């Protein structure tokens, strides 16, 4: 058959200019020098943590925690992160942002003018505080409840209502049908402060985190600074297993129909279910062409 005659495709080579390392605590880092444009760099921290890890009484906490990363850390109290970055031309919502998805949460500081070492150090310190040193002050949490309540309210359009009807049927028997990151208004308005702190301590930990720095930087210096700044962060005792949720097989085609009086258009989604692909298999050309 054609499938049997298909030659084995080679693996995708790792860019030799990317410095990849892992600290003893499990945190992974990726650093690459790139002079286009000059004197600019991007900083990321990615967490393999999203709304899928929430329990029913935590729905919305992954997204809420993302918001709280801009509301006070040990080294940048209050709006300190936003205020300091604005002094170097990095603006919230433009070059400074984050997103929460079902499976991951990613924070970015982009287009940073790395014209002196102190700026690089401070951006890494922000990543450090996001990773391990959020304040999560009660007054700030309560202030953010109103912000996220409004985000939830304005997001309750026809498409969201249709998603909430269709997803539990499309992903029947799986948490994926019930974990849109915005969560539920009951949780947003009423969760106890400690619930958010517990979620942070449980899941924001080195073995689930990766640092990415790309730009006009000295790779050796950045690597040394990451080792100096992040190596002290300890894994929690008896860390919870990061379970990767599955979606049950189905023999018959699943068909779901959702209607809403405010949606005048017909929208059709066709989803093809396939076995989960392990990360190590994603580095081959075969994965890209399949």
Over which residues does each language-model region extend?
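An aromatic/glycine/proline-enriched structural segment found at the starts
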Residues: 5-6, 173, 210-268, 272-276
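Histidine-acidic residue clusters that define the catalytic metal-binding segment
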Residues: 5-19, 107-110, 117, 125, ...
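Mature N-terminal segment immediately following signal peptide/propeptide cleavage
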Residues: 7-45
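Short, surface-exposed beta-strand/loop micro-motifs that present aromatic residues
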Residues: 18-20, 28-34, 197-202, 252-260
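Short, solvent-exposed loop/turn segments at the edges of secondary structure
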Residues: 24, 38-40, 89, 100-104, ...
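Active-site-adjacent, His/Asp/Glu-enriched structural segments that form or flank metal-binding
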Residues: 38, 47-161, 190, 194-208, ...
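Extended catalytic-interface subdomain
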Residues: 108-112, 131, 256, 264-290
